[in-house]
Amino acid sequence: MKLKKRMGGESLFDTFNKGDVVMAFFPCTRFEVQILLWFRGEAMQQKNWSEADKLEYCMKLHDELHRNYMLISKMVIVLQKRGIPVIIENPYSTQHYLTNYWCIKPKVIDKDRHATGDYMKKPTQYWFIGIEPKDNLIMEQVNYKKRLSVSNLFGTKDYVVQRSMISKDYVNRFIREFIVDGEPKPIEEEKTLFDYEV
């Protein structure tokens, strides 16, 4: 498959260089397990829909799923051709679309993010493409947070944002455990991932 020069124009990826690492939080709404309920016509919101309404909506969802699948695959192809490693984050479940229908397998699966300093359990998978995850041992106490669940947040003003938030402590540990070379030391507050050599 030959990709056009990013649809004939400039690309975000033109600004990346070898030595950079892309961390992609790719939209999950069409890959995650809840989409299966919609495809089967069993989502609560579809309770009073006609079969024709369900089919029309499912065709629209399938187009969106296909679009996202093409985008994530094209992104990886472009980055691989440029020699730029990428780490992709998405929810984990055995029914997740990419888990079952993508030729690249995740290299890190975190089944309980709360255990390593996040606000929620949220099982998450990470694809390390063009880079191998490190296996650094972090010998320090986890800064546990009050555990939240999506159901606790439902109906709040910023529900959509809050359910996607990741705590600084979780990110700090993840970077030091899986991305940064050498002896892992706590990352200082004013530094970011961009301040570290990979």
Feature-to-residue mapping (PLM):
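Conserved active-site and SAM-binding loop architecture
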Residues: 1-197
